[in-house]
Amino acid sequence: MLLKAASTFSLLNIHGEKKDISPLFSSSSSISSPVSSGKSGNLSFPLRASKSSTTTTSTLSGVVFEPFEEVKKEMDLVPSGQQLSLARHLYSPECEAAVNEQINVEYNVSYVYHALYAYFDRDNVALKGLAKFFKESSVEEREHAELLMEYQNKRGGRVKLQPMVLPQSEFDHPEKGDALYAMELALSLEKLVNEKLLNLHSVASKNDDVQLADFIESVFLNEQVEAIKKISEYVSQLRRLGKGHGTWHFDQELLGAAA
């Protein structure tokens, strides 16, 4: 028994009745045309389309950014009291306290360097190169403290200055001499500052404060490494020279380099 494939038009009965054949022509995107039946034999059939894509108002990710809705929760974070910082945002109390501690470290080191400057500037010591070096070092450490204070205010923290330790006023050493002893003391202080800065950086990392971590990295850490290297070289040179006439020549070289 042979089966013949029926043509599309055979789906219409002989009496001209229309049957729904749209499933044969449905697509994800086409135009719609009505069925018209005029004279016998001139038939047309519908081409129906359905657009399945969403409107273009939604983004490709399906997430619509609504700024006025999302900012509502941020508005609740803006304090209304006059004594509260408006700029503070994602700044933990632990980071704030660590910055204040570093400010105190910088001021204390600056104070020691200022005492060293005063010592070498005496008329009975008269090592002007060392005096100038330690005076500049004192100013540099004070500027570091001021940078930290400025950053504290930027983040909405409160600067709380702490007491400073009274530095010694005599730096002569019976074996090493005053120049070598003072430079070794300076090297120890710079390494201490470096440790404190690394500790501050770890506090920032622990609290996921990338802004504070970036500030410490970009402003302080590389400069601290350079300072340690420079003072290490000065210590090595003074150890070679001893306490004699070579100290004066070292001081003159330092005075010329600092000028």
Swiss-Prot record:
Chemical reaction(s) catalysed: 4 Fe(2+) + O2 + 4 H(+) = 4 Fe(3+) + 2 H2O
One MF term in the entry's GO annotations: ferric iron binding
Protein family: Belongs to the ferritin family.
Induction annotation: By iron overload treatment.
A Pfam family recorded for this sequence: Ferritin
Chain residues that bind Fe cation 2: 141, 190, 224
Gene expressing this chain: FER3
Protein name: Ferritin-3, chloroplastic
Entry keywords, A to Z: Chloroplast, Iron, Iron storage, Metal-binding, Oxidoreductase, Plastid, Transit peptide
GO biological process: flower development; intracellular iron ion homeostasis; iron ion transport; leaf development; photosynthesis; response to iron ion; response to reactive oxygen species
Complexes and interactors: Oligomer of 24 subunits. There are two types of subunits: L (light) chain and H (heavy) chain. The major chain can be light or heavy, depending on the species and tissue type. The functional molecule forms a roughly spherical shell with a diameter of 12 nm and contains a central cavity into which the insoluble mineral iron core is deposited.
Location, primary (coarse class): plastid
Subcellular location: Plastid, Chloroplast
